[in-house]
Amino acid sequence: MTDTRNGEDNGKLLYCSFCGKSQHEVRKLIAGPSVFICDECVDLCNDIIREEVQEAQAESSAHKLPSPKEISGILDQYVIGQERAKKVLAVAVYNHYKRLNQRDKKNDDVELGKSNILLIGPTGSGKTLLAETLARLLNVPFTIADATTLTEAGYVGEDVENIIQKLLQKCDYDVEKAQMGIVYIDEIDKISRKSDNPSITRDVSGEGVQQALLKLIEGTVASVPPQGGRKHPQQEFLQVDTRNILFICGGAFSGLEKVIQNRSTRGGIGFNAEVRSKEEGKKVGESLREVEPDDLVKFGLIPEFVGRLPVLATLDELDEAALIQILTEPKNALTKQYAKLFEMEGVDLEFRTDALKSVARRALERKTGARGLRSILEGVLLDTMYEIPSQSDVSKVVIDESVIDGTSKPLLIYENSEPPAKAAPDA
């Protein structure tokens, strides 16, 4: 084959044999035996092949479901700790998609029910990351919804059916794909009703939303306007069956540990009562492991809603050692991400052990868990990331504890020179 650019073959104007455009209308025209193809048609063919390969891979991965151990092993690469939660999620997700793979088989007199999941754990403990990693592993559409923005139909705010619309957007409005997806509803504890007793007043963002979510989570046919349009009577809707969508709800449930402790430590009063010291109190994570459906009802979730979330997984608070692991070990660890950014500038980035410990301590003080690690590192590295692109002679940047504490600046090591003395502490 020859590449015919903007020259003519024997004074004759050449055309693409596929789209009919002349050589002057395209960037390149490739010549074959008695045929020509332009660069635009080549790009189009590549796109078609790429789409077909992706669809074939998606179909094969749907039939090749990883085992619970394999699922947990992949979660280990991204999420530190939380072994119990990983095991619960791996089994629940495996059973859910095994059920979907079997649903078309005839002469099966046993109908398997759907097991939606409730994740309970402190802020920054990895609830959202677990759900995201599961969806990526299984190659299914995934969306995150914030329960605090949801209201009952007819009130200002997001309708619960908007959740399904977001899921459709993730898969280009392919209804079949959406019906195999995963929905993560965050901050689910924020829609708890304010007291144990049903209120006579309308609670449009609490109990009312729980009622609206019931059918969606259990399984219904949701009517969603196509391509994200607004609803109006003359419009045709996309019908999405939610029976096979896996719903994972997550929340911090602050104060739930007190409900559990009150139930488990209920005792008598008087001289014969058992005396308990404050030191005997359990950690939040240990208390949450003992949660029962009645505790969630007392917290403010309605019994019907609790019943729709039969699989319960609790996550522990992250300690200093776990936060240091999160900074360094996962595939997407923050220190690896920042090292990659510096590497693009031809600079090595080194975090000393005392610096990592200091970052972890600051995150614990802020009570933000792993979520606060990035903001701490961003603040520490901001000035360095601003200056480095303008300095071509820097070969290495070293971060130690004093840099994290703000008492000194990062150590810059220059090419072909002795390492300079550390910068004096800021006045």
UniProtKB/Swiss-Prot annotation:
CDD domains, alphabetized: RecA-like_ClpX
Keyword terms, alphabetized: ATP-binding, Chaperone, Metal-binding, Nucleotide-binding, Zinc
All copies of domain ClpX-type ZB, residue ranges: 4-57
Residues bound to ATP: 122-129
Gene Ontology CC, one term: HslUV protease complex
GO MF, one annotated term: ATP hydrolysis activity
Pfam families cross-referenced by the UniProt entry: AAA_2 (PF07724), ClpB_D2-small (PF10431), zf-C4_ClpX (PF06689)
Span of the signal peptide: none
Record InterPro entries: AAA+_ATPase (IPR003593), ATP-dep_Clp_protease_ClpX (IPR050052), ATPase_AAA_core (IPR003959), Clp_ATPase_C (IPR019489), Clp_protease_ATP-bd_su_ClpX (IPR004487), ClpX_bact (IPR046425), P-loop_NTPase (IPR027417), Znf_CppX_C4 (IPR010603)
SMART domains, A to Z: AAA (SM00382), ClpB_D2-small (SM01086), zf-C4_ClpX (SM00994)
Positions with a binding annotation for Zn(2+): 16, 19, 38, 41
Gene Ontology biological-process entries: cell division; proteolysis involved in protein catabolic process
UniProt xrefs under NCBIfam families: clpX, PRK05342.1
Function, as annotated: ATP-dependent specificity component of the Clp protease. It directs the protease to specific substrates. Can perform chaperone functions in the absence of ClpP.
HAMAP family to which the protein is assigned, alphabetical: ClpX
Quaternary assembly: Component of the ClpX-ClpP complex. Forms a hexameric ring that, in the presence of ATP, binds to fourteen ClpP subunits assembled into a disk-like structure with a central cavity, resembling the structure of eukaryotic proteasomes.
Family, similarity comment: Belongs to the ClpX chaperone family.
The protein's name: ATP-dependent Clp protease ATP-binding subunit ClpX
Source species: Pseudomonas syringae pv. tomato (strain ATCC BAA-871 / DC3000)
Gene name in the database record: clpX
